[in-house]
């Protein structure tokens, strides 16, 4: 009996070791997926893409060379994890369609048709951008990430189309890149508040944990300002709960390994982040610093024929990112890389919805960009190639 028990314990330990670096791929839907037909289209596309992507990922030995955490025990969950938020916008879209029915009697057929297309394809993208809609989606996504983490899985988020808004906001709101003491100093809080914070140090936290839904420290305004709770005594009391709220609100520590955005229109909808006067840039700098220092990668992969696949930025080396941000990045290992020139061999009218049917081409590009992105940022020989 003892021998059997010992064997069981050894097998359990072996299983835990083997699964230590198992990855879950979480796929996040885009716009126009809020009815049953489109939901099924999206989910069927993911189920066809995932095994092809998984196979290419596991076969590529260079990934293990450049990403040291992905050692010989690397495994990827066989089933895709599908995070679907499209149903949450359906009630609002139904209201828009009712208003369209009113216009049908007074508009030309061409105008009515154009309005219908705009509403169908852009409504969800506009809907999910609104803070009061986005925040519950982020909390639900975080529960999905936590569930995978509780099973011993690291995660890579795959954001499709308007799903790239969700991945961006998830990193912005859920990564623990905020040092509370430095935050209060930056915001020029009252001296007695800063002294209180220094006397009661807390761990790094995330934007979500600071909000009134959690710790009640403050909220980010539409202008990009973090507005502190004006009740100083309540602010101090709330501050002491930050560590607990960080545990509840922020991404599980070390579990989010990367993001792959594709069919990405994020530049079109979030162009204000390029404005130096927009204060969210301060937090974006901290977020990117965290990404680079914690070995997280952000890839953007677009078909060149995709009219909604916008390049996110010019590719920069790790040193150039540091210079551009104006912050010190210590021992960077993260990757931020854009490849918006993937040839899908599809016409422009079909390219945005062809990432599933052209899954071989798309999967090959993702795996190639994992490697080339790392080499671009850290390999001087690769950086100096004439092609770049």
Language model features by range: what are they?
Residues 29-33, 126-292:
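Serine-dependent carboxylesterase/thioesterase catalytic core
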Residues 40-49, 169-176, 316-317:
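Amphipathic alpha-helical scaffolding segments
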Residues 33-35, 88-90, 165, 267, ...:
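Short, acidic Gly/Pro/Ser/Thr-rich loop/turn segments
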Residues 37, 228-230, 249-388:
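Lipolytic serine-hydrolase domain surface
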Residues 28-151:
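Active-site catalytic motif of lipid deacylating hydrolases and related acyltransferases
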Residues 21-25:
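Extreme N-terminal starter segment of soluble prokaryotic enzymes
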Residues 1-20:
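Classical Sec-dependent N-terminal signal peptides that target proteins to the secretory pathway
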Residues 26, 81-83, 156, 258-260, ...:
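Hydrophobic/aromatic beta-strand patches that form the interior of the parallel beta-sheet core
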């Amino acid at each position: 009996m003892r021998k059997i028990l010992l064997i069981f314990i050894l097998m359990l330990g072996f299983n835990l070791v083997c699964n230590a670096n198992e990855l879950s791929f979480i796929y996040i839907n885009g716009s126009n997926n809020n009815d049953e037909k489109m939901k099924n289209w999206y989910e069927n596309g993911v189920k066809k893409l995932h095994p092809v992507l998984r196979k290419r990922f596991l076969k590529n030995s260079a990934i293990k060379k450049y990403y040291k955490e992905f050692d010989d025990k690397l495994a990827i969950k066989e089933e895709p994890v599908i995070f679907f938020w499209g149903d949450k916008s359906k009630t609002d879209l139904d209201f828009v369609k009712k208003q369209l029915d009113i216009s049908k009697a007074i508009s030309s057929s061409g105008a009515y048709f154009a309005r219908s297309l705009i509403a169908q394809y852009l409504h969800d993208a506009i809907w999910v951008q609104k803070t009061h809609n986005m925040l519950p989606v982020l909390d639900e996504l975080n529960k999905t990430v936590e569930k995978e983490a509780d099973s011993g899985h690291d995660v890579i988020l795959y954001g499709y189309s308007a799903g790239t808004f969700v991945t961006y906001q998830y990193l912005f709101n859920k990564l623990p890149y905020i040092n509370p003491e430095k935050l209060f100093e930056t915001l020029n809080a009252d001296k007695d508040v800063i002294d209180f914070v220094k006397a009661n140090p807390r761990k790094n936290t995330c934007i979500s944990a600071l909000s009134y839904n959690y710790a009640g420290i403050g909220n980010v305004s539409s202008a990009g300002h973090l507005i502190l709770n004006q009740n100083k005594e309540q602010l101090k009391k709330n501050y002491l709960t930050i560590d607990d709220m960080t545990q509840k609100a922020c991404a599980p520590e070390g579990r989010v390994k990367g993001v792959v955005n594709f069919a990405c229109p994020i530049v079109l909808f979030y162009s204000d982040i390029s404005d130096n006067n927009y204060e969210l840039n301060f937090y974006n700098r901290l977020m990117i610093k965290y990404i680079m220092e914690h070995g997280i990668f952000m890839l953007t992969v677009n078909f060149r024929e995709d009219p909604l696949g916008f390049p996110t930025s010019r590719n920069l080396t790790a040193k150039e990112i540091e210079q551009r941000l104006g912050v010190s990045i210590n021992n960077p290992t993260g990757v931020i890389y854009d490849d918006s020139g993937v040839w899908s061999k599809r016409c422009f009218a079909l390219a945005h919805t062809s990432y599933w049917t052209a899954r071989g081409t798309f999967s090959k590009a993702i795996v190639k960009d994992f490697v080339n992105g790392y080499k671009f940022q850290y390999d001087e020989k690769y950086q100096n190639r004439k092609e770049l």
